Amino acid sequence: MSIRIDDLTVTFKNGVTAVDHVDLEIPHGIFGLLGENGAGKTTLMRVLTTVLAPTSGKVLLDGTLYCEANYEKIQKKIGYLPQETDLYPSLTVRECLEYMGDLAGIEKRESKKRIDYYLEKTSLADHQKKKMRQLSGGMKRRVGLVQALLHEPDFLIVDEPTTGLDPEERIRIRNLLVDFAEERTVLFSTHVVEDLMATCNQLAVMKKGRFLYTGTMRELLNKARGHVWECCTEDESLARELERKYHISSKQYTEEGIRLRLLGENMPSESGCIACDVTLEDAYIYVTNR
């Protein structure tokens, strides 16, 4: 499964350009899309799920051009987990999934088989008789993931799947996506750096509708290497001065004083600053603020 995006632009009627002349190839496995809220990630995913037509440029899914004549064919190959998954609150989990299977045109016996399989995979089998409105946010997200997989898509798109979840549920969702990516391509959109550290090797960093970086995790980390320092000071005025001069990826109050992680082009001249290893969060802040 290959997805290619060529010179894609989306400009809304109010003149706002949400996606600005982007190019991208999404390989098999999990591909991360990292960016702050408002970066253009959701608009891009609306194009990839055929909900929104681009202003210009093109998208190809295994060589099939995104256009109205091909949308039905493309939709059969795509599964989508939106950020909000408030599915039919009065139905039970199983009833909801059976209904989604009917909408997808899956034969009932095959639908039951797939529902049983994915309920087990997502640890929802014991909750299948619960009403959707009784579920926690994490459980609803897992039901949403099952509905996105019922028709066995080749390309799975997930939008901020861990937002608002507790740490245990966040880990569960990430592990499920890694598992499901063995047989398909997954586009994982998030603003949570930790999500991508745990799931993928390749990613794109998006800001204001453009890609600032596309490539491997290691290459992204290398971009910030030599540009990250740590300083610990008890002098609050010095800490404020450093915050004005550098981008800050971390600030902690410790027994020794205020500990800052600084990002910039040149090593700080202030005493006590030392070079340190780069984290993905450091690298993300570095490339988005150059």
Where are these regions (language model features)?
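Conserved structural motif at the start of ABC-family nucleotide-binding domains
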Residues: I3, A18-V19, Q75
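Catalytic Walker B motif of ABC-type/P-loop ATPase nucleotide-binding domains
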Residues: L156-E160
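Conserved ABC transporter NBD signature motif
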Residues: G57-C67, K73-I74
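Conserved ABC ATPase "signature" region
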Residues: E98, D102, R109-H127
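Walker A (P-loop) phosphate-binding loop of ABC-type ATPase nucleotide-binding domains
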Residues: E36-G40
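Helix-to-loop junction immediately C-terminal to a conserved catalytic motif
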Residues: T49
